[in-house]
């Protein structure tokens, strides 16, 4: 059983990806350069026979005997690329095959080391004092005007009103005699003015 891959459908791959020396032998198919360690079989049966006889019987595998017809075998091999399990499509002669578990040649490091350091610690130098000075409150008491205390009691006992109104100018049990007489005089003037207006 042979595995054959059409080279014309493959993209152009540079040999520098694998970092190995390319072989001097190269064949160009459809404008794609492929470095190979092995020579392609020339399109004549004699060259194909020499190629087959140059190999030891132990090295001849199913891919070498793909067809009994030499021309058909050459047609198959000329459009095929040798492959192995580790490296996939062998585009270059490589003395060291890539392991299938770690494909280091195809790895691209997308990690970015950012040289940015953000310091989230903020030092706040704000101090709030809740202590209040009481010296001002003492001064405020001194600045307040001291009004004289109003005496509710009358100066003399002669002017005390009774429950019944009297016109003699004397009253009993009256605490606001001065305000009473002032209001009484004002009411008399208002009454006299109303009578005159009528």
UniProtKB/Swiss-Prot annotation:
Primary localization: host cell
GO CC list: host cell cytoplasm
Location relative to the cell: Host cytoplasm
Originating species: Rotavirus A (strain RVA/Rabbit/United States/ALA/XXXX/G3P11[14])
Cofactor(s) required for function per UniProt: Mg(2+)
GO biological-process terms attached to the record: viral genome replication
UniProt keyword annotations, A-Z: Glycoprotein, Host cytoplasm, Magnesium, Metal-binding, Nucleotide-binding, Phosphoprotein, RNA-binding
PTM: O-glycosylated. Hyperphosphorylated on serine residues, when in dimeric form. Phosphorylation by host CK1 is required for the hyperphosphorylation of NSP5 dimer.
The protein's name in its UniProt record: Non-structural protein 5
Post-translational modification Phosphoserine, affected residues: 67, 154, 156, 164, 166
Coiled coil (residue ranges): none
């Amino acid at each position: 059983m042979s595995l054959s891959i059409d080279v014309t459908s493959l993209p152009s791959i540079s040999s520098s990806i694998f970092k190995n020396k390319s072989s001097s032998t190269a064949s160009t198919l459809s404008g794609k350069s492929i470095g190979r360690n092995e020579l392609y079989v020339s399109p004549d049966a004699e060259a194909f026979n020499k190629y087959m006889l140059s190999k030891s019987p132990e090295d001849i595998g199913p891919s070498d005997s793909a067809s009994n017809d030499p021309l058909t075998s050459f047609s198959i091999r000329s459009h095929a690329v040798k492959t192995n399990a580790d490296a996939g499509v062998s585009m270059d002669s490589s003395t060291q095959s890539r392991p299938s578990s770690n494909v280091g040649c195809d790895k691209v490091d997308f990690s970015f080391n950012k040289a940015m350091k953000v310091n989230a610690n903020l030092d706040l130098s704000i101090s709030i004092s809740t202590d209040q000075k009481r010296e001002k409150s003492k001064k405020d008491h001194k600045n307040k005007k001291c009004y004289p205390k109003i005496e509710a009691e009358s100066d003399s006992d002669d002017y005390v009103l009774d429950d019944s109104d009297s016109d003699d100018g004397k009253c009993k049990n009256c605490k606001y005699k001065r305000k009473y007489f002032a209001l009484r005089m004002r009411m008399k003037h208002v009454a006299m003015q109303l009578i005159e207006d009528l």
